[in-house]
């Protein structure tokens, strides 16, 4: 009887671990948004090499060069607040996008035409624009930067 209970408990443990394990170490959409788009310090954003450094540092040049990316130089709370501002339709047709009511300080990074992996070379453009972001989850948080206008 004791051996049977142990086997059942062991089987349940294996089942639970098999269910939980795949999500361990997987980056959430909210964490990916922060990694790819948030740079509150923006220490060298005015430098022409800012995008080259940040794209590499944030793992967006592993295996290929990400063609376009935007870094936001505002507090995370300000970006999260966009999720309760003006709702708009996302580029993919979904209805979970929101447009910031004011402009935010951003840096656009665009892959130069002649650039090829592994030598990813980006142009750096500093500007003030409104952001359109997709929000999801509970709590409702940014998960995708859809556009800047």
Curated annotation (Swiss-Prot):
Organism phylogeny = Eukaryota, Metazoa, Chordata, Craniata, Vertebrata
Keywords for this entry?
Answer: Disulfide bond, Endonuclease, Hydrolase, Lyase, Nuclease, Secreted, Signal
Q: How does it assemble?
A: Monomer.
Any GO CC annotation of this UniProt entry: extracellular region
Q: Where is the signal peptide?
A: 1-25
Show the Pfam families listed in the entry: RnaseA
* Cellular compartments annotated: Secreted
Name used for this protein in its record: Ribonuclease pancreatic alpha-type
**Family, per entry:** Belongs to the pancreatic ribonuclease family.
Record the organism: Rattus fuscipes
Which residues are noted in the entry as substrate-binding? 32, 35, 66-70, 91, 110
């Amino acid at each position: 009887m004791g051996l049977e209970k142990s086997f059942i408990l062991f089987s349940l443990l294996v089942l639970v671990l098999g269910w939980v394990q795949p999500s361990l170490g997987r980056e959430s959409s909210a964490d990916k948004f922060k990694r790819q788009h948030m740079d509150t310090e923006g220490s060298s954003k005015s430098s022409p090499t800012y995008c080259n450094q940040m794209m590499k540092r944030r793992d967006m040049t592993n295996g290929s060069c990400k063609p376009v990316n935007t870094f936001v130089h505002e507090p995370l709370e300000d970006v999260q607040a966009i999720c309760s501002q003006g709702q708009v339709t996302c580029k993919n047709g979904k209805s979970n996008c929101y447009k910031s009511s004011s402009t935010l300080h951003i840096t656009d990074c665009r892959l130069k035409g002649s650039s090829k992996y592994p030598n990813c070379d980006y142009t750096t453009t500093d500007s003030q624009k409104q952001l359109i972001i997709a929000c999801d989850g509970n709590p409702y948080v940014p998960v995708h930067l859809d556009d800047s206008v």
